[in-house]
Structure formats: C-alpha cells, structure tokens
UniProtKB/Swiss-Prot annotation:
It comes from Bovine papillomavirus type 3. This is Major capsid protein L1. Forms an icosahedral capsid with a T=7 symmetry and a 50 nm diameter. The capsid is composed of 72 pentamers linked to each other by disulfide bonds and associated with L2 proteins. Binds to heparan sulfate proteoglycans on cell surface of basal layer keratinocytes to provide initial virion attachment. This binding mediates a conformational change in the virus capsid that facilitates efficient infection. The virion enters the host cell via endocytosis. During virus trafficking, L1 protein dissociates from the viral DNA and the genomic DNA is released to the host nucleus. Signal peptide: none annotated. Gene3D superfamilies: Major capsid L1 (late) superfamily, Papillomavirus. The gene is L1. The keyword Disulfide bond applies. GO terms for biological process: endocytosis involved in viral entry into host cell; virion attachment to host cell.
Length: 510
C-alpha cells in the first residue's frame, strides 16, 4: 500500500529583484604600452612624540609619533591634457585617458629603533604576575610613573580613495544612565587622517571619552581616538577603490601583567552570596581587584622583517578596481613603528655653551623630546584608455559623478530664451545681482587632514633613469637604454701543474 507524504525538502526561490552587477575595470579599460615614473621628494617630519606644544592655541611644535598614520594624497596630472608623441594614442570623441598603478615603493629613512611611550601618572596598582605578598590596601592615589614600548606595526594601504578606519566609541543609551554606570559602546567607521594614532597595544577606541581617569593609557593616546583599518569593509567594497592592496606586519607580546586601582564597577557574581567562581577563605573577607591588563611590548626590530624599501608590483588588485586612479589621485596610508627612536636633547638653562671647568648639576639642564621621520614614495603608472560606452558611463556615474564632470564630455544643453544683461551690476539703481548658478567644484575631502603631494610636474617616461623604473623594466622584460659597454676580452691562463708533453717524433721509413 502506498501513502502520500508531504515533501520534507525546502524549496529555495531566487530573490525577487535582480542583484546589482558591478563592472570590473578590466571590462571597459584598455591598457597601453606607455609607462611613466614619478616620485615624491624627501618628506620629513619633526615634532614631539607625545603631544602638541601650543601657545595661545597656536601649535609651536606638532605631535610626531612613530605610531601615527601617515596619509599621503598624491595628485597626478590629467592625462587628457598631455601632449603625446603619437597623436593617435586615443580618440577624444569617444575615449578618455586614466592612470593605472603598476608599481610602488615606499622608502623609509633613519635607522631602526624602538620607541618608548608612557605616563607619569599611570594607573598601575599591583603586579598580578609575580605577587608574593598579599595585596596592600589601596590609597587615595596609587598611580606610578610607567613607560612601555608600543606594539610593533608596519602597514600600508593603497587606493584611490581614503582608507576606512574603525574604532569603538560611546553609543546612545536606550535609557538614562545612572552616575557611575558603564556606557554602551559601538563600532564606528571613519576615514583615517594623517596624524591619527594606530593601535599601540591598548586597543582601538576613543580614549578621550572612555578613559575618564586620564591614567589608563600612555600620553600619546590618552586624549586621542585610536583607529585600526577596516579591512573587512574595504575588502567587500563593490568598487574596490579604497584598497587596491595592502601589506602589514604586526608583532606584540605581553611583558608584564598588572591590575588597575580604583573601585570595581562589576564585581565577581554573585555579590554577597556563595559564588561559583571562588571559595571564601578565612582572613579574606574581600577579594582584590579583578581588573587585569597587560603591558604591551613590540620586542625586537630587525631589517630582515621589513615591508618598506622594496618594490611591489600590481598584477591583479584584490577588488574590482584593478589599480585605476580615478580623479587622478592616489591615497597611501602607512604606519611604521620600527623607526620610533625618540631623541633626547639637553641644553643648559642659562649658558649657550659650556666650558671645560663647568660641573654637572641636574637642575641646570633642560631636556626635550623630539621624533623625526623620513619618507619617500616612488610610483610606476600605466596609461590606460576608457571607452565611453553607455555601460561604462553608467557605472562610473554611479560610483562617482565627479569623474565624468572632470572629463568635459561636452553635452549639448537645451537652447535658452533671450536673457537680460545689466551693465552696472553693483549699482543701487538696478536689482541685486543674481547668485552664481555654477558653483565651484568642491573637494569632498576638504574637511579631512592629509599630506597633499603635488606630482603634476614630476612625471617622466625615462624609466631607466630611476631605481624603481629599472626594476620595472626588468620585470616586464625590457632592456634599459643605457650606455653600451664593450665586452671584456677573454683571458686564459695555463696551469703550471700540468707537465708539458714532449713533441712526437716522426717515424722514419726503413
């Protein structure tokens, strides 16, 4: 006998609306065999490693730390305004030219060194690692002078839009918070700007709002927002503009285990009753603090583990943008804490120079801190052609309409009727002058802080005259146009160890 049974399997239907299809730049961009080299000048930074030195809200000495992000905004010339030797490079009626990144080398100067950061009033109550004695009672102020070496970070992100960062900040509470309650926190995404701090081993959060004691972090981050690149968001970007590729190397270990001083906000549960976490003992009515933390340490720095001072070649980017520099610009976000040495400069309080008979007195000398950085960026760019097809224009317009506006495609406007033209616009006898309709093109990143580097006049087709250019020519199998050298003459030497053979005698016919 047969029975009818309902189907146990699930039926999956496609989504009612079609999924948006994003074009890859290789679908509508044609690459040429024309390459250019460009590089920045030597970019130098000098400042105080912990904070800005101000006088009446004017920055006298800026903050320059080895754990700061450096964001270089490299501006390129418009290739559509170039004069090429071959006039038939592209058809200006239905094509436009753009730059594509093929190679980059980020160079760092200065010797390797470990930076030191700290706080003269650091909230370190008791050693929780090797605690031989019982925990003493807390006093009103148990803060100490403490210094650590930050986490070792080497990282750079390359894209045609700024790098996205993430940090934890105070969130909006559903109900009114009571005094002393822990605020809710949320993950926020913001653009990483030049001079902002990276993670030094204390986390990526807003220390200005989440550290009310001003003693839970070193001086360089205690009043700052520490950010970390949001690789997940940039990796899933449908356009792939913010991150063509990245390279990073992080290293840290916990050097000491300490505990915080103060009142515990959340005690070990349950409060005042038998706890599943510990057994009460005689002579211990109250437990010591359970707020632990570790002091970071970046450990050894070595030239064997460096991502800088070496070229990187882009064959295929991680996203859909395969290295096309839209709007003729490139953003390089970098950080390097392996050259974090802080200079200690000492000067006499009264005398400009000391004499041989002077003696040392500690109070007569003033000590200053300075940190210096040295950067240089070299690029190899490839000239590419964009076909102005409807699909390509629709894709570019949805991504960034400013790109099409900068191309001056020359759309024909509808004819207007005759308009009135007054001669004396500023005269009080006539009407007020009308407002200008065509507003100037605004920079979308004007409110952000970057290091703007103008490379419009630093392009060269002679790649063999530059170090990165010669490396690139070797990669693609082209010989550099150098001076031909004559081949050395071959010289042979006879070995003295070989015995000379006697000449053979001819046999006489008998």
């Amino acid at each position: 006998m047969s029975f009818w049974l309902p189907s146990q399997g699930k039926l999956y239907l496609p989504p009612p609306t079609a999924v948006t299809q994003y074009l890859d730049t290789d679908d509508f961009v044609t690459r040429t065999d024309t390459f250019y080299h460009t590089n920045t000048e030597r970019l130098l930074f000098v400042g105080h490693p912990y904070f800005d030195i101000k006088r009446e809200d004017k920055v006298l000495v800026p903050k320059v730390s080895g754990s700061q992000f450096r964001v270089f905004r490299l501006k390129f010339p418009d290739p559509n305004k170039f004069s090429f030797p071959d006039p038939n490079v592209y058809n200006s009626d239905n094509q436009r030219l753009v730059w594509a990144l093929r190679g980059i080398e980020i160079c760092r100067g200065q010797p390797l060194g470990i930076g030191v950061t700290g706080h003269p009033s650091f909230n370190k109550f008791k050693d929780a690692e090797n605690n031989n004695n019982k925990t003493p009672d807390q006093t009103t102020d148990d803060r100490v002078n403490m210094a650590v070496d930050p986490k070792q970070v080497q990282m750079f992100i390359v894209g045609c839009t700024p790098c996205d960062g993430e940090h934890w900040d105070v969130a909006q509470a559903c109900d009114r918070l009571e005094p002393g309650a822990c605020p809710p926190i949320e993950l926020k995404n913001t653009i990483i700007e030049d001079g902002e701090m990276c993670d030094t081993g204390f986390g990526n959060m807003n220390f200005q709002k989440l550290q009310a004691s001003k003693s839970g972090a070193p001086l360089d981050i205690v009043n700052q927002i520490v950010k970390y690149p949001d690789f997940l968001k940039m990796g899933s970007d449908p356009h792939g503009n913010s991150m063509f590729f990245y390279a990073k190397r992080e290293q840290m270990y916990v050097r000491h285990l300490w505990s915080r001083g103060g009142t515990i906000g959340e005690e070990i549960p349950p409060n005042g009753e038998a706890s599943p976490y510990y057994l009460p003992g005689a002579g211990r009515a109250t437990l010591p603090t359970s707020v632990y933390f570790g002091s970071p340490s970046g450990s050894l720095v070595s030239s064997d583990q460096q991502i800088y001072n070496r070229p990187f070649w882009i064959q295929r980017a991680q996203g859909r943008n395969n290295g096309i520099c839209w709007n003729n610009q490139l953003f390089v976000t970098a950080v390097d804490s392996t050259r974090g040495t802080n200079f200690t400069i000492s000067v006499h309080r009264d005398k400009p120079s000391l004499e041989d008979q002077d003696t040392y007195t500690a109070a007569e000398f003033k000590h200053y801190l300075r940190h210096v950085e040295e950067w240089e960026v070299s690029l190899v760019l490839q000239l590419c052609i964009v076909d102005l097809t409807p699909e390509a224009l629709a894709h570019i317009n949805g991504m960034d309409p400013r790109i099409i506006e900068s191309w001056n495609l020359g759309f024909i406007h509808a004819p207007n009727n005759i308009e009135d033209q007054y001669r004396y616009l500023q005269s009080i006898a006539t009407r007020c002058p009308p407002k200008e309709d065509a507003a100037a093109t605004e920079d979308p990143y004007a409110k952000y802080t970057f290091w703007d580097v103008d490379l419009t006049e630093r392009f060269s087709m002679n790649l063999d005259q530059y170090s990165l250019g010669r490396k690139f020519l070797f990669q693609i199998g082209k010989k550099s146009r150098g001076i031909k050298r004559s081949a050395p003459k071959a010289v042979t030497f006879e070995s003295s160890s070989r015995s000379k053979k006697a000449p053979k005698r001819r046999r006489k016919n008998v």
